């Protein structure tokens, strides 16, 4: 999936912004992600909300070819993005042609909703996604 997202940019050296909000912006997750994207020939930056938000989310996201969003709690991700205006910045990036992709929470967030374990051990509906795609997304449907 990662290579498919990178190929959609049609760039030899895509500019990628990592957004790992759903997992709490863990430094080890960033390190592994930087390693993977650098190995794939990308220029990498990040947009963090912990412990302090990165400045200029709209400019940071808009200057990239691909935004890659990691997994974790989609409920926390959506709440924090809305609090910090990242939701609007993501929409603007998408409308400007930036490829938006990700895994788990980083996949559900683009849709109207889907299922999540963000509220407890069982899958529950999440219905307040960004709505960039007018569908539901069932990640982890087999787990």
Task: Show where each model-derived region lies.
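N-terminal beta1-alpha1 cap of cysteine-dependent amidohydrolase-like domains
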Residues: 1-66
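Short, surface-exposed connector motifs at secondary-structure boundaries
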Residues: 12-17, 72-73, 133
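Short beta-strand segments
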Residues: 19-20, 69-70, 138
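Short, glycine/serine-rich, charged loops/turns that create anion-binding
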Residues: 23, 73, 107
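Class I SAM-dependent methyltransferase SAM-binding "motif I" and its flanking Rossmann-like core
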Residues: 78-143
């Amino acid at each position: 999936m990662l290579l498919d997202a990178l190929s959609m940019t049609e760039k030899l050296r895509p500019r990628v912004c990592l957004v790992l909000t759903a997992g709490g912006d863990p430094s080890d997750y960033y390190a592994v992600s930087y390693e993977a994207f650098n190995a794939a020939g990308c220029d990498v930056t990040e947009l963090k909300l912990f412990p302090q938000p990165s400045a200029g989310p709209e400019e940071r996201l808009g200057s990239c070819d691909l935004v890659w969003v990691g997994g974790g709690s989609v409920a926390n991700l959506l709440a924090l993005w809305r609090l910090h205006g990242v939701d609007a910045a993501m929409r603007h990036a998408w409308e400007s042609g930036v490829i938006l992709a990700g895994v788990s929470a980083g996949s559900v967030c683009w849709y109207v909703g889907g299922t999540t374990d963000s509220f407890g051990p069982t899958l529950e509906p999440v219905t307040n996604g960004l709505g960039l795609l007018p569908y539901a997304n069932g990640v982890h449907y087999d787990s």
